[in-house]
């Protein structure tokens, strides 16, 4: 994973602001590289343009730290690459993926139809990424995010063009690059009309309607004699195989972290609410990892004085954190994991915020601005800056949970009955269960849709959710978590896994036609629940869904009247 910053200016090379450089280095602490070059637009007497490329690197692929930006000295072309190309053209990538991508792009630039060839290379990539590629021969800038928008890329057209993993400021000119295609900017045209709007090239040139240019949505309604989902249903066996295949490149061969302790060989951590989606990932990851590697489970809980006051719980009491829904389910699922995989070295990291060592109530911070609390105030402004251009109370609630979870510092224990001690995870890879609710009917609105109009209404609702995956706030989440020099990976959003899920008949994923009273397991995400049961986790299989901001209690800390759509006050 990397940090990207690119500027195109008319008058001179633009320096990188120090705060931006610092944030980029937080994302990629292993290397900082800069390349400057001039572009000579192919329109006669136009003045040259000044291009500055900056990349920082978090080295997670290959056997060495690969320096960026990539640059081809003879041509002057350059690439800033932030992502993980798990496959190119359907084939697994060996070694460093950025090097492989740049090699293919330079070969494509030599072809007669170079623009189409460059687009074809990028279309063939499977995995999360954001990139900026300068094709010097044609004076074109090509940039974008993967079709699911799993990595951050922002742009600003004030006084030139800036492309960056993070915003330099909270100026309203910063916007997200949409994950709707590959953007190609002809610098010859842009030099004459820099205000011209960008238009993307499509991710796919295939005819026919597809979801996210990945697969065709299955609209088939269940036949009258459709068998109810059981543990032996083909889709339960298939989801285990598909999810395992998705996990393999994401958890295997992760380099040893720089802060490696010989007594603690831990390279993978899980954003762990104790819910169904993340616990299944942890359980399957345990099947894949070598026996000497540990798995850290990061569970975050916030002190919410509004709820504490309502419940009559002391804001200074330990029970504030232990009463959080995600802490309760986290401990329960942790116990189940240690029971079904006793040989694995599990570690539950309880991240409580504010830390228990601090006895100043968070109400003093948020509702009484005149009360100093410098550490928390500093974090608040940092989180607001990172999540920008998103700026609502809902954004802040979610970003808080992800930001402090990714920091990975808390009280840890290796067994439910073991003593706790302060701990910081060395793992640089975070696994997230995001995507399962959209694919398998896990939201509250899905049973409501079924009650309203049967399977037809349910299919329409799921299609809307899946179609919006590329427009989810994954860029915001990437900025919040990557700040700590860690990379989040989404096994449920693997392209091949998504393709299988959307092409699978709906009754083989969430058979709302068969009630919970018949099977003992609720219909939403039933295929995943049955997998959890097959993996020996009967309690996890019956766990209810909660949104992250409510499970960790970051929502409505100050007032129950606060709406998620309200704009925040920096």
State each model region's role.
Residues 14, 99, 177, 237, ...:
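A structural signal for well-ordered alpha-helical segments within the folded catalytic domains
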Residues 422-570:
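Mid-to-C-terminal catalytic subdomains of enzymes
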Residues 301-420, 427, 445-455, 478-487, ...:
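ATP-dependent adenylate-handling ligase core
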Residues 57, 85, 133-135, 147-148, ...:
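Short, flexible loop/turn elements at secondary-structure junctions
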Residues 11-12, 91, 108-112, 140, ...:
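Short helix-capping/linker segments at secondary-structure and domain boundaries
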Residues 1-344:
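Cysteine-centered catalytic environments shared across enzyme families
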Residues 132, 142, 162, 296-298, ...:
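Hydrophobic/aromatic beta-strand patches that form the interior of the parallel beta-sheet core
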Residues 91, 114-117, 121, 352-353, ...:
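Active-site- or binding-pocket-proximal scaffold segments within functional domains
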């Amino acid at each position: 994973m990397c940090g990207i910053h690119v500027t195109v200016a008319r008058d001179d090379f633009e320096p990188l602001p120090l705060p931006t450089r610092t944030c980029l280095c937080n994302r990629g602490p292993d290397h900082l590289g800069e390349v400057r070059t001039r572009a000579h637009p192919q329109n006669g007497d136009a003045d040259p343009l000044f291009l500055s490329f900056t990349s920082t690197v978090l080295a997670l692929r290959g056997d060495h730290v690969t320096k960026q930006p990539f640059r081809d000295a003879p041509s002057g072309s350059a690439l800033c690459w932030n992502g993980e190309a798990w496959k190119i053209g359907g084939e697994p990538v060996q070694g460093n993926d950025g090097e492989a991508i740049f090699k293919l792009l330079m070969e494509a630039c030599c072809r007669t139809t170079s623009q189409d060839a460059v687009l074809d290379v990028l279309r063939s990539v499977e995995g999360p990424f954001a990139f900026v590629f300068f094709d010097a021969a044609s004076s074109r800038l090509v940039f974008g995010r993967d079709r699911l928008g799993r990595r951050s890329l922002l742009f600003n057209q004030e006084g030139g063009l800036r492309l960056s993993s993070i915003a330099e400021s909270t100026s309203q000119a910063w916007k997200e690059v949409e994950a709707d295609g590959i953007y190609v900017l002809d610098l010859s045209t842009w030099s004459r009309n820099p205000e011209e709007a960008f238009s993307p090239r499509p991710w796919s040139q295939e005819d026919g309607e597809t979801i996210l240019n990945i697969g065709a949505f299955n609209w088939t309604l269940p036949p009258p004699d459709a068998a109810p989902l059981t543990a032996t249903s083909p889709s339960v066996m298939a989801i285990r195989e598909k999810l395992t295949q998705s996990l393999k490149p994401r958890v295997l061969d992760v380099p040893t972290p720089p802060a490696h302790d010989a007594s603690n060989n831990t390279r993978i951590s899980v954003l762990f609410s104790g819910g169904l989606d993340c616990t299944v990932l942890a359980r399957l990851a345990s099947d894949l990892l070598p026996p000497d590697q540990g798995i850290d489970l990061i569970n975050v809980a916030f002190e919410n004085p509004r709820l504490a006051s309502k419940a009559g719980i002391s804001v200074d009491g330990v029970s504030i954190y232990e009463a959080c829904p995600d802490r309760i389910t986290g401990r329960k699922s942790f116990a189940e994991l240690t029971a079904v995989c006793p040989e694995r070295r599990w570690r539950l990291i309880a991240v409580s915020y504010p830390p228990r060592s601090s006895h100043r109530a968070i109400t003093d911070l948020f509702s009484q601005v005149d009360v100093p609390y410098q550490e928390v105030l500093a974090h608040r402004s940092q989180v607001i800056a990172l999540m920008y251009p998103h700026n609502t109370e809902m954004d802040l609630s979610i970003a808080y949970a992800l930001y402090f979870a990714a920091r990975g510092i808390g009280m840890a224990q290796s067994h439910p009955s073991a003593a706790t001690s302060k701990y910081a995870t060395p793992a640089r890879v975070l696994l997230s269960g995001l995507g399962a609710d959209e694919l398998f009917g896990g939201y509250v609105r899905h049973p409501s849709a079924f009650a309203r109009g049967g399977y037809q209404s349910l299919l329409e609702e799921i299609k809307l959710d899946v179609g919006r995956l590329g427009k989810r706030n994954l860029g915001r989440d990437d900025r919040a978590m990557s700040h700590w020099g860690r990379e989040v990976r989404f096994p449920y959003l693997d392209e091949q896994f998504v393709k299988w899920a959307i092409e699978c008949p709906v009754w083989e994923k969430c058979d709302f036609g068969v009630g919970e009273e018949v099977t003992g397991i609720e219909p939403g995400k039933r295929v995943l629940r049955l997998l959890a049961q097959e993996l020996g986790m009967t309690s996890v299989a019956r766990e209810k869904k909660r949104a992250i901001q409510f499970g960790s209690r970051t929502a409505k800390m100050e007032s129950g009247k606060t709406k998620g759509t309200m704009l925040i006050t920096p």
